[in-house]
């Protein structure tokens, strides 16, 4: 595994291959003051990362399910009716009437 540029430079020297514009090592930036860079921040105790999560979860879930409804609903209904038919057929074949009807067909 090859060491990174920071490790080759020892973490404090000039990066290898960059001789023109160097601000300094880690924690020791010693260059000209930069201008025109604006950054905005908000205090961590003023943030609300879960704002609207429950509301969005309900309505986003409804939107996504309703848009996919025609893809999964027909197979769900078909599966329900096939299972219902199979259960009823099994009950009939294991009943007294079903055994009497198919008694001579066993192999």
UniProtKB/Swiss-Prot annotation:
Gene that produces this protein: qcr8
GO BP of this protein: mitochondrial electron transport, ubiquinol to cytochrome c
Keywords on record: Electron transport, Membrane, Mitochondrion, Mitochondrion inner membrane, Respiratory chain, Transmembrane, Transmembrane helix, Transport
Coarse class of the protein's main subcellular location: mitochondrion
All ranges on the Mitochondrial matrix side of the membrane: 1-62
Pfam families tied to this protein: UcrQ
Protein's cellular compartments: Mitochondrion inner membrane
Propeptide positions: 1-8
Taxonomic path: Eukaryota, Fungi, Dikarya, Ascomycota, Pezizomycotina
Family membership noted in the UniProt record: Belongs to the UQCRQ/QCR8 family.
Organism: Neurospora crassa (strain ATCC 24698 / 74-OR23-1A / CBS 708.71 / DSM 1257 / FGSC 987)
Function: Component of the ubiquinol-cytochrome c oxidoreductase, a multisubunit transmembrane complex that is part of the mitochondrial electron transport chain which drives oxidative phosphorylation.
Protein name: Cytochrome b-c1 complex subunit 8
GO cellular component terms given for this protein: mitochondrial inner membrane; respiratory chain complex III
Transport recorded as keyword: yes
Quaternary structure (record): Component of the ubiquinol-cytochrome c oxidoreductase (cytochrome b-c1 complex, complex III, CIII), a multisubunit enzyme composed of 10 subunits. The complex is composed of 3 respiratory subunits cytochrome b (cob), cytochrome c1 (cyt-1) and Rieske protein (fes-1), 2 core protein subunits pep and ucr-1, and 5 low-molecular weight protein subunits qcr6, qcr7, qcr8, qcr9 and probably NCU16844/qcr10.
Sequence intervals crossing the membrane: 63-93
Keyword Nucleotide-binding: no
Annotated InterPro entries: Cyt_bc1_su8, Cyt_bc1_su8_sf
Membrane protein topology class: Single-pass membrane protein
């Amino acid at each position: 595994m090859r060491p990174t540029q920071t490790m080759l430079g020892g973490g404090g020297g000039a990066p290898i291959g960059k001789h023109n514009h160097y601000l300094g090592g880690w924690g020791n930036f010693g260059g000209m003051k930069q201008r025109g860079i604006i950054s905005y921040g908000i205090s961590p105790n003023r943030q609300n990362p879960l704002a609207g999560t429950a509301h969005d979860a309900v309505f986003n879930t409804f939107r996504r399910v309703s848009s996919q409804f025609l893809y999964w609903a027909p197979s769900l209904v078909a599966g329900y009716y096939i299972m219902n038919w199979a259960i009823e057929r099994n009950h009939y074949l294991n009943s007294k009437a079903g055994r009497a009807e198919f008694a001579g067909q066993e192999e």
